[in-house]
């Protein structure tokens, strides 16, 4: 599950929402309507790796346990990050499980590969969107020709396989893959490999 972190508030959402509404209204007013084309904002989510959450890098790495972890202890900030991103990669597997996933409330569970409602997440291909949208719905493949998206992800083709309660209309949350976090605090929602926050793009649904 893609869970939009509060610390992504540095994205200027009022301005972004206004731009999305304006551009999509223009598309809707064409004689052919949207016709499988939307104007979207691409954001990023990822699977944080426990190995990056150290005191040396400025994280709260105090080892704690939570319901569902059977007494196994993990860095406090790592569990905070898993709570926001949905899954986390463990440094050492537990009973063959390389990941933990957030289970809601204050609870976690050991799991296999990160997945959404549409199966295992594939780095730089899987994406999440707000549920209930008629065009940008689960199972749809889209092309986002933005040069920024191509530069960050090395890809412009996505399949919507996931949802998230904090996602906005016309937002495509692109799955980056596994990485250590960029840094503590607000940078915990960013993978170490990029400082990307958001980019606008047209999105065409593949027929």
Question: Can you say where each PLM-predicted feature lies in the sequence?
Answer:
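Solvent-exposed, well-ordered loop and adjacent helix/strand elements within mature globular domains
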Residues: 22-207
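Acidic, low-complexity intrinsically disordered segments
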Residues: 2-14
């Amino acid at each position: 599950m893609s869970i939009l972190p509060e610390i992504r508030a540095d994205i200027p959402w009022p301005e972004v929402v206004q731009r999305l509404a304006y551009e999509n209204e223009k598309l809707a007013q064409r004689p052919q309507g949207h016709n499988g084309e939307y104007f979207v904002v691409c954001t990023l989510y990822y699977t944080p790796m426990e190995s990056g959450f150290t005191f040396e890098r400025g994280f709260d790495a105090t080892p704690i346990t939570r319901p569902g972890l059977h007494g196994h202890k993990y860095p406090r900030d790592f569990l905070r990050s898993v709570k926001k991103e949905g899954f986390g990669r463990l440094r050492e597997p537990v009973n063959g499980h390389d990941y933990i996933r957030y289970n809601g409330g204050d609870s976690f569970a050991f799991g296999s590969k990160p997945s959404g409602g549409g199966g295992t997440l594939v780095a730089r291909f899987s994406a999440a969107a707000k549920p209930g949208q008629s065009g940008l719905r689960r199972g749809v493949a889209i092309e986002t020709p933005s040069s920024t998206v191509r530069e960050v992800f090395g890809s412009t083709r996505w399949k919507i396989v996931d949802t998230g309660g904090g996602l906005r209309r016309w937002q495509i949350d692109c799955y980056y893959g596994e990485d250590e976090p960029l840094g503590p605090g607000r940078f915990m929602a960013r993978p170490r490999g990029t400082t990307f926050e958001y980019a606008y793009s047209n999105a065409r649904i593949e027929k």
